[in-house]
Amino acid sequence: MRTIPIVMAATVAALGAVHATAQGSDPNLGRSLAATCATCHGTNGVSVGEVESLAGKPKDEIVRKMQDFKSGAKPATVMHQLAKGYTDEQIQLLAGWFAAQKAK
C-alpha cells in the first residue's frame, strides 16, 4: 500500500518537470504572454499613453513589480488582479521578453 503514494508523488514530480520543460522550450511563449499587455503597455512594451513602458526595463525590476502586484504589496487599479493570473515562471518569461525589447 505504501507504493501508491510514492508512485503518485513521482508522477506529480514528473508532470511538473514536463510542464517546466515545455514552457522553457518555446521561445515564443514570452512574446505570446506579453501580447496580452499591449492594450495598456503598447506594442512590444512601448506605451503611447501615460501607462509605463516596459520595453528595455531590467528583467529583475519587472519581476519584482509583478510579484508586488501579485502579492498586493504594490497598490494598483488593475495590475494586482492581472498579476495573480500568471505563474512565477510566466512572470519570468514576460519580464525577460520585455527586457529584451528596445526602449523608445
Residue ranges and their predicted role:
Residues T43, G72, Q101-K104:
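Generic structural signal for alpha-helix termini and adjacent loop/cap motifs
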Residues K84-K104:
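C-terminal capping alpha-helices of c-type cytochrome domains
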Residues A35-T43, L94:
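The canonical Cys-X-X-Cys-His
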Residues V46-S47:
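Short, non-ligating residues that shape and space the ligands of small metal-coordination modules
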Residues A14-A34, E50-E52, V63, D68, ...:
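Electrostatic cytochrome c docking/interface patches
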Residues Q67-E89:
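Short Fe-S-cluster ligation motifs
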Residues G56:
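Conserved strand-loop elements at the edges of beta-sheets that form or border functional pockets
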